[in-house]
Amino acid sequence: MLKLHGFSVSNYYNMVKLALLEKG
C-alpha cells in the first residue's frame, strides 16, 4: 500500500514538473 501510494505521488510530481517545464 505504501509502495503504491509512493508511486502515485511520484507520478503526480512528475506530471507537475512536466507542466512547469512546458509553461517555461
Curated annotation (Swiss-Prot):
Q: What is its EC number?
A: 2.5.1.18
Enzyme's top EC category: transferase
This protein's UniProt keywords = Cytoplasm, Transferase
What protein family does this chain belong to?
A: Belongs to the GST superfamily.
> What's the subunit arrangement here?
Monomer and homodimer.
Q: Name one GO molecular function term.
A: glutathione transferase activity
Q: Please give the name of this protein.
A: Glutathione S-transferase
Catalytic activity, as annotated: RX + glutathione = an S-substituted glutathione + a halide anion + H(+)
Function field: Conjugation of reduced glutathione to a wide number of exogenous and endogenous hydrophobic electrophiles.
Listed under GO cellular component are: cytoplasm
Source taxon at top rank: Bacteria
Name its cellular compartments.
Answer: Cytoplasm
